[in-house]
Amino acid sequence: MDLLKSPLYSKYIESNAKLVNFAGWEMPISFSGLINEHESVRTSAGFFDISHMGVISLRGINPKEYIQKFFPTNLYSFSEGQGLYTLMLNEKGGIIDDLIIYDLGQQEEDISEIFLIVNASRYQTDFSWIKNNLNTNNISISNAKKDKVLFALQGKNSFKLFEEWIKSSISHIPYFGCEYKIFKHISSKEKIFFSKTGYTGENGLEILLSAKAAINLWDFLVSKNIKPCGLGARDTLRLEAGMHLYGQDLNETTTPYEAGLGWLVHLENNHDFFGREFLEKQSRFGINKKLVGLNIEGRAIGRKGCEVFKDGENIGTITSGSWSPTKQKAIAFAYIQNSYATLNNVVEILIRGKTFKGTITKRAFYKKDI
């Protein structure tokens, strides 16, 4: 089976990228090297092609009313021009996907539009789940990305670089805010979507635009000595920032409370949603396992599947792990028995047949300077 390719694939080849199969897409794992790319984002800026991710459009009269049942978070807690990080759940409260939902407001008379930016591996599942359970003809659902590019510009210099490219200020847009508009010097017809969001723990933007405009932006950034970055750096950046990766830290058998995402469950809102009954019970009676952060002694990396012990008892499993270029230590996420999930508790981690000490910590290993 042929791998899917981004419209920017030719730029990968031109830039000597190392390519891998990621969720059925041929994507760059690195360009100039993971550490180099990671540090560029932390100190200045870097950019990523994230076109493997999905963009679902929902259009109609008041689409929030019809799609609220898919999300445990109150969709009326954010308004036009804003985004919201949330979860889509199954009937048992398991996480189908974690995603960002954007309110684009009214696009034509009485017709409003919502964008969902979803994980690459979950696009078909998400699309089918919504389509099969909408139960209304008042909302249309479609692929908003098609042959477009999803582009991420991340780092403390990202805003001023983007402003220079669009020749317009974005200072009025808040964190998680978005716009969908035409910039005439780029294209007299194309509407470009962008949001102040990211997956790195830094200031950043995620941008949906045509291949032609994306190549223009790529070349502009390279001319400013900004590096293209691959999925390797994206993974170490997100792990340092305490952000989940679907398929490793989240899946359909984990719930928001277990994943440390209970703040996204608005039971007090009294709206009905898939999984509500199960989560009400879990909220009342507690959880058996919990996702925690781990600082690991030495330089051994605890990868997905490594077992966690306490006094010889197996208490959990690592889901994500890497070396932290910023903190210069091994870090990881692990699901462990809730009774052991206390900060500063020392545990043992089995890595390639050897035992290493680990200390339970908060999941955010890094926070940017304000």
Swiss-Prot record:
GO molecular function: aminomethyltransferase activity; transaminase activity
A Pfam family that the UniProt record links to this protein: GCV_T
Catalysed reactions, semicolon-separated: N(6)-[(R)-S(8)-aminomethyldihydrolipoyl]-L-lysyl-[protein] + (6S)-5,6,7,8-tetrahydrofolate = N(6)-[(R)-dihydrolipoyl]-L-lysyl-[protein] + (6R)-5,10-methylene-5,6,7,8-tetrahydrofolate + NH4(+)
EC number: 2.1.2.10
GO biological process, alphabetically ordered: glycine decarboxylation via glycine cleavage system
Enzyme class: transferase
GO CC terms of this entry: cytosol; glycine cleavage complex
Keywords in alphabetical order: Aminotransferase, Transferase
Superkingdom of this protein's organism: Bacteria
SUPFAM superfamilies to which the protein is assigned, alphabetical: Aminomethyltransferase beta-barrel domain (SSF101790), Folate-binding domain (SSF103025)
Similarity comment: family membership: Belongs to the GcvT family.
Cited PANTHER family: AMINOMETHYLTRANSFERASE, AMINOMETHYLTRANSFERASE, MITOCHONDRIAL
Function statement: The glycine cleavage system catalyzes the degradation of glycine.
Quaternary data: The glycine cleavage system is composed of four proteins: P, T, L and H.
UniProt cross-references to NCBIfam families, sorted A to Z: gcvT, PRK00389.1
Protein name (Swiss-Prot/TrEMBL): Aminomethyltransferase
UniProt organism field: Prochlorococcus marinus subsp. pastoris (strain CCMP1986 / NIES-2087 / MED4)
Lineage, uppermost ranks: Bacteria, Bacillati, Cyanobacteriota, Cyanophyceae, Synechococcales
